[in-house]
Amino acid sequence: REEFEAISAPNFDERGQVGSEYLKIFKELWTNENPSFSGEYESFDNIFFAPKPVQKPHPPIWVGGESAPALKRAASLGDCWYPIGSNPRFPLDNRDRLQARISRLQGFAEEFGRDPNEIDLAYSASWFETSPNQKREKWFIGSPDEVTEDITQIKELGVNHLVLSFPGTSTSEILDKMSY
């Protein structure tokens, strides 16, 4: 909240709606020679915007978030859905949980008249436990073979982009965690 207030941004509680509007604005700026837009937070017309993106119609828009509003944003405006698997409110740390959210995203896409298969899927994991005594209730806990199986399951769900963020405060600590 403080960051929003410090830069006189729209209300923090409206950040989802603001984000959706800004995505629409970017698409307008990137794809039209004479962009114009009238929204709740921003409006403009008769402006020149350059350079236009090389990628057509525009660079892929990755939309993060795991909540229903975020899924709707990804389904209506995104080219890729990019959830963080470790969100404590919406943990997506095993096959069943991620599959349920993907199904919900696809349902929203259909409601918006989009082909769900046109929305690419990404996934971010930032927890790892290599202790052989650790109970395997979620992905990325266990032996290298078990983690390999986790990655296979994620791919089988249609995820094409996997981001692994290893926690640590130093390069050596991070490398140690990566090298099990």
Feature roles, as predicted:
Residues 1-180:
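Active-site-adjacent structural elements that line small-molecule/cofactor binding pockets in enzymes
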